[in-house]
């Protein structure tokens, strides 16, 4: 009933506004055309383009709150970013209802039962100020004027931790995306942020380092190249070939390394694009042990261009202003290849030490997507010097022995096979109870263990975190999540094995 009510409200919102209806039909049509070329060519209305770029940026111009439309059509505030304009106003609180919006031009916009995308369009508009009317839980109405400000994107923050297991210290850095500053607002870049975390972790006396790229869907290719260069002295990182063009070698832009010790990279089926670039490059150099399950298999390059007949790509400087009303297109320009000439396209990166993962049962990879571009190779002379081969066979044997004695991974392997069977069965039960059981098997997960090892921050971060209650709470949650992760534990043990074997 709730789902039906949501659909009914959405359709009613669209149909009540002719312009919104025209936009909805136009968006569907243009998205369908774009998707017929390859999975990553996509039409973006202006607000979707902004949201996409924001997801890959460390800082954005925002008001600093998120909304949710309830089943009855009311729009509620569900979270507020500390330090943002909404937070600093002191007049907007979680669970407040958003009643109306007044733009800088004086246009009043009713909020209840707003059509999908209508509010997104308002908040992503280049206009830097709005007046909101909110209603608190006691019924009080408050008018709040907000001015956009630079707000940190918490989801893209790089955080480094020390993992202590059996008296050995391993550095751990999770990288959620290859973000960068897209415009004049600047902000941090992921390669630079990772380098800073490594410096702090080295001061803690780490003996090895884990870079977690699981669920990292990619982002800025230049950042991926710079990140790879942190771990090698100099040399080529990837080969790129645009449609009809020659193959170009892209190299590490800086000589020297930030970290030259034992390195492991965690990947899974949702590690894509730039993540695969980094994992593949460091694998080809024998620089890192790749741990986990096969990656997604995307090795294509995209760029976002305006649908504006006055725009000339050949004369672009990056400072042009565009007609945003026509939208934008994210278009595939070419393919990325490994320095060996091989490709991760469709194939993904094969881990050196494989760990079972339920994500393998979903079969959601580049290969499964309609119109995915084929995999091929390129012939180009590339000169690079690999490090000595890693003791992969010994690492695989030791890891396999541990997995065979691990109740968690034994249960996980069993569940993986069961889930694969259920997923392969295309017969969906229509009886409610049978469907519920079928769905539970599809979405089943193994309960994480708890407190597998000690996790703590570098001393520099600890002092800063203690100054902020919100930061302290979020940090405690992250530490707990890491310490309960059996994949991180096994990866840390593999790093300990590597250190022992190389001694």
Task: Please name every model-derived segment.
Residues 1-8, 338-502:
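Conserved functional hotspot residues or short segments at active or partner-binding sites
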Residues 4, 8, 30-34, 38, ...:
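Amphipathic, well-packed alpha-helical segments that form the structural scaffold of globular domains
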Residues 13-19, 248-252, 300, 333, ...:
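Conserved phosphate-chemistry cores used by DNA topoisomerases
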Residues 274, 286, 291-364:
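Polar, glycine-rich mid-to-C-terminal structural blocks
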Residues 95:
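Conserved catalytic motifs of ABC-family nucleotide-binding domains
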Residues 18-23, 43-60, 76-81, 85-87, ...:
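Cleft-lining beta-strand/loop regions that shape enzyme active-site pockets
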Residues 68, 133-137, 337:
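A generic structural motif
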Residues 1-62, 67, 71:
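Extended, domain-scale alpha-helical bundle/helix-rich regions
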């Amino acid at each position: 009933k709730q789902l039906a009510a949501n659909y009914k409200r959405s359709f009613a919102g669209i149909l009540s506004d002719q312009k919104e209806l025209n936009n909805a039909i136009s968006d569907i049509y243009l998205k369908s055309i774009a998707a017929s070329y390859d999975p990553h060519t996509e039409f973006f209305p202006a607000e979707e383009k902004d949201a996409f770029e924001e997801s890959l940026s460390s800082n954005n111009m925002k008001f600093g709150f998120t909304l949710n439309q309830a089943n009855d059509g009311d729009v509620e505030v569900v979270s507020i970013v500390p330090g943002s304009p909404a937070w600093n106003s002191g007049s907007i609180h979680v669970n407040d209802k958003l009643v109306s919006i007044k733009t800088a031009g004086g246009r009043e916009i009713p909020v209840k039962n707003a059509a999908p995308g209508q509010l997104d369009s308002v908040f992503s508009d280049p206009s830097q100020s709005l007046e909101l009317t909110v209603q608190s839980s006691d019924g009080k109405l408050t008018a709040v004027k907000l001015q956009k400000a630079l707000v940190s994107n918490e989801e893209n923050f790089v955080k480094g931790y020390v993992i202590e297991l059996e008296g050995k210290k391993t550095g751990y850095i999770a990288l959620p995306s290859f973000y960068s500053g897209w415009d004049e607002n600047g902000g941090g870049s992921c390669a630079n942020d990772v380098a800073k975390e490594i410096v702090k972790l080295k001061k803690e006396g780490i003996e090895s380092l884990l870079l977690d790229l699981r669920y990292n869907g990619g982002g800025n290719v230049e950042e991926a190249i710079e990140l790879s260069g942190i771990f090698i002295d100099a040399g080529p990182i990837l080969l790129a070939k645009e449609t009809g063009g020659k193959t170009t070698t892209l190299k590490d832009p800086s000589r020297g390394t930030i970290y030259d010790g034992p390195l492991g990279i965690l990947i899974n089926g949702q590690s894509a694009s730039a993540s695969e670039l980094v994992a593949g490059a460091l694998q080809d150099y024998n620089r890192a042990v790749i741990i986990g399950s096969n990656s997604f298999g995307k090795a294509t390059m995209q760029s976002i261009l305006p649908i504006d007949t006055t725009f000339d790509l050949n004369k672009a400087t990056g400072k042009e202003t565009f007609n945003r009303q026509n939208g934008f297109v994210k278009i595939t320009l070419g393919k990325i290849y490994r320095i060996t000439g091989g490709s991760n396209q469709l194939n993904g990166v094969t881990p050196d030490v494989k760990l079972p993962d339920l994500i393998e049962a979903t079969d959601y990879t580049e290969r499964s997507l309609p119109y995915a571009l084929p995999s091929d190779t390129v012939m180009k002379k590339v000169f690079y010097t690999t490090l000595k081969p890693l003791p992969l066979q010994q690492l695989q044997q030791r890891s396999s022995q541990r997995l065979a004695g691990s109740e968690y991974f034994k249960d996980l392997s069993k569940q993986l096979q069961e889930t694969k069977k259920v997923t392969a069965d295309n017969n969906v039960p229509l009886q409610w109870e049978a469907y519920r059981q079928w769905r539970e098997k599809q979405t089943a997960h193994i309960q994480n263990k708890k407190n597998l090892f000690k996790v703590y921050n570098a001393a520099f971060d600890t002092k800063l975190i203690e100054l902020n209650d919100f930061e302290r709470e979020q940090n405690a949650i992250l530490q707990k999540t890491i310490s309960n992760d059996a994949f991180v534990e096994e990866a840390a043990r593999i790093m300990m094995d590597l250190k022992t074997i190389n001694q």
